[in-house]
């Protein structure tokens, strides 16, 4: 589902998205979108995922969420039936005992701390699971709700394929906002003037085109238990006459206009596997990477679904490397002559080679389609040997760098590091990713997050890892950083770790390498899912 918007306003600490004439505003609440009208008595609508069950017609997940809300003292949040248990009710379970709807506003991310609920949703009893229900694509002024939420393990960065039967994307007309949300939106439209229709001066609610896949969203009308009451002076709390869902006639809200689009390809779908991992095919994909992803026009023979996937890949490239390739990542020492898009393809190849989440199969399909569309007199066997050597060196150095920083983090957790009188400044990116590496390292060596650790010790670990990340990201070889750490610690352990990781390669899976891939996946998807997409047009790198 896609919702175009014209402008945004920050009000009471929450971002609101206005349509073109400012007659209606959207805001995010617990992974769902709520639409409110300017006009007194206008329709309020809610768009989002409801939880269902583990199979067709099953409502076990919805029943479990309702029972947990009752058990934890949040009876006020329990819906009247199993058909309307929205994702924001799931968010309430992990939001603390005193949480209300107001506390869920502003994010599409929904935390799932209950392993039983996680087992229902992704068939694994994991903790620290995050469901990402949508995204704000600021470049396009669009809010997007995914067909099925993306499930991410925030501890290690792994992505899971959710049970599709557990979710359904629906639209519901609301008769009132919850009390906390009424206070949030009170006075919202006062500071935003309405833009009247230039042709007839009408101030009727503007039609909003909501774009959905061919499997359109269900239409659910809330069944209100309360008796009819007179309209009050508060525009978002009025009880309107009771409406019942009729099997033979359901209508959309006055402001909604549904448009269908072809199904959007999930480029990270693990069921879509690459046909080959030979170096020659990888070199071809790297050679044509910029043309395949950044070429503005659709070439002959390119399927619509693959064409749509190019935009998704582009946003992932921007998230990892920046709009102009300004964000550093691993493999820079040997890959500095490659574009960010080419380095992205190499990362996807490595993840695919080791059977982690990746989109290399889609890139392979795009490359094959592009090469087939080239004129017959073009020489497609034009990948130079120098480029092949660069690709191999970049892939190997990338995995070795990730492996070294991961094993270093695991080792530092057990070493008594000398305290420093002060810390040198490190980049914000290195600090954030250093924390992610250490969190995964603790999991890898069996240390629980619940074990108390002195704050100064944690800061010391984070400083060393973030400082070393800055060194790697600048293109400095692993060896130099390992030697510096040997001097600091008065120990040869760092250089021994270096020689242990330097022998591995990215093209032949081996046991220790699987741990390295866990770090690579955590850092890569940490950027893809947490870095906002920048504004602007596609820029050649």
UniProtKB/Swiss-Prot annotation:
| Key words of the record | Host cytoplasm, Host nucleus, Virion, Virion tegument
**InterPro entries the record matches:** Herpes_UL21
Domain of life of the organism encoding this protein: Viruses
Primary site of residence: virion
Which Pfam families does the UniProt record give?
Herpes_UL21
| Record's subcellular location | Virion tegument; Host cytoplasm; Host nucleus
The Gene Ontology CC terms held by the record are: host cell cytoplasm; host cell nucleus; viral tegument
UniProt record similarity statement: Belongs to the alphaherpesvirinae UL21 protein family.
Question: Whom does it interact with, and what assembly results?
Answer: Interacts (via C-terminus) with UL16.
Function field: May participate in DNA packaging/capsid maturation events. Promotes efficient incorporation of tegument proteins UL46, UL49, and US3 homologs into virions. May also play a role in capsid transport to the trans-Golgi network (TGN).
Designated name of the protein = Tegument protein UL21 homolog
Q: Source species, please? A: Varicella-zoster virus (strain Oka vaccine)
């Amino acid at each position: 589902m896609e919702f175009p918007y014209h402008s945004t306003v920050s009000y009471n600490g929450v971002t609101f998205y206005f349509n073109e004439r400012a007659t209606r505003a959207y805001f995010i609440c617990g992974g769902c979108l709520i639409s409110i009208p300017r006009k007194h008595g206008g329709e309020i609508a809610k768009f989002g995922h409801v939880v269902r069950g583990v199979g067709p017609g099953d409502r076990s997940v919805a029943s479990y969420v309702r029972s947990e809300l009752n058990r934890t003292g949040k009876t006020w949040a329990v819906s009247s039936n199993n058909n309307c248990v929205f994702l924001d009710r799931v968010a309430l379970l992990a939001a603390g005992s005193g949480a209300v709807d107001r506390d869920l506003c502003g994010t599409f991310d929904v935390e799932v701390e209950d392993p039983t609920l996680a087992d229902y949703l992704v068939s694994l009893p994991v903790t620290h699971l995050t469901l990402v229900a949508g995204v704000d694509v600021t470049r396009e002024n669009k809010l997007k709700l995914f067909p099925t939420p993306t499930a991410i393990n925030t501890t290690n960065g792994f992505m899971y394929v959710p049970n599709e039967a557990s979710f359904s994307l629906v639209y519901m007309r609301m008769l009132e906002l919850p009390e906390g949300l009424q206070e949030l939106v009170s006075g919202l439209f006062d500071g935003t003037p309405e833009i009247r229709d230039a042709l007839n001066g009408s101030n009727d609610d503007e039609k909003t085109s909501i774009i959905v896949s061919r499997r359109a969203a269900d239409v659910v009308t809330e069944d209100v238990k309360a008796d009819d009451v007179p309209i009050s002076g508060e525009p978002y709390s009025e009880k309107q006459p009771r409406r019942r869902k009729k099997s033979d006639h359901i209508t959309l809200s006055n402001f909604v206009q549904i448009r269908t689009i072809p199904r959007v390809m999930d480029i990270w779908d693990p069921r879509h596997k690459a046909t080959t991992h030979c170096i020659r095919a990888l070199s071809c994909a790297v050679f044509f990477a910029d043309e395949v992803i950044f070429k503005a026009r659709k070439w002959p023979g390119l399927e619509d679904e693959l064409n749509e996937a190019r935009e998704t890949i582009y946003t992932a490239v921007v998230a990892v490397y920046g709009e102009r390739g300004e964000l550093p990542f691993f493999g820079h020492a040997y890959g500095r002559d490659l574009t960010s898009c080419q380095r992205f393809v190499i990362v996807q190849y490595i993840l695919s080679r080791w059977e982690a989440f990746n989109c290399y199969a889609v890139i392979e399909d795009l490359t094959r389609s592009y090469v087939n569309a080239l004129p017959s007199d073009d020489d497609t066997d034009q990948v130079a040997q120098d480029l092949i050597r660069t690709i191999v060196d970049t892939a190997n150095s990338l995995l070795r760098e990730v492996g070294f920083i991961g094993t270093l983090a695991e080792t530092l957790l057990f070493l008594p590091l000398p305290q420093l009188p002060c810390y040198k400044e490190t980049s914000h990116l290195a600090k954030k990713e250093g924390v992610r590496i250490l969190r995964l390292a603790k999991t890898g060596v069996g240390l629980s997050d619940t074990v108390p650790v002195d704050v100064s010790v944690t800061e010391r670990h984070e400083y060393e890892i973030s400082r070393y990340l800055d060194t790697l990201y600048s293109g400095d070889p692993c060896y130099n950083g390992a030697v510096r750490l040997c001097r600091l610690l008065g120990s040869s352990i760092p250089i021994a770790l270096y020689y242990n990781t330097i022998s591995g390669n990215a093209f032949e899976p081996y046991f220790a390498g699987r741990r390295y891939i866990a770090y690579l996946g955590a850092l890569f998807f940490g950027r893809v899912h947490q870095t906002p997409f920048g504004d602007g047009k596609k820029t050649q790198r």
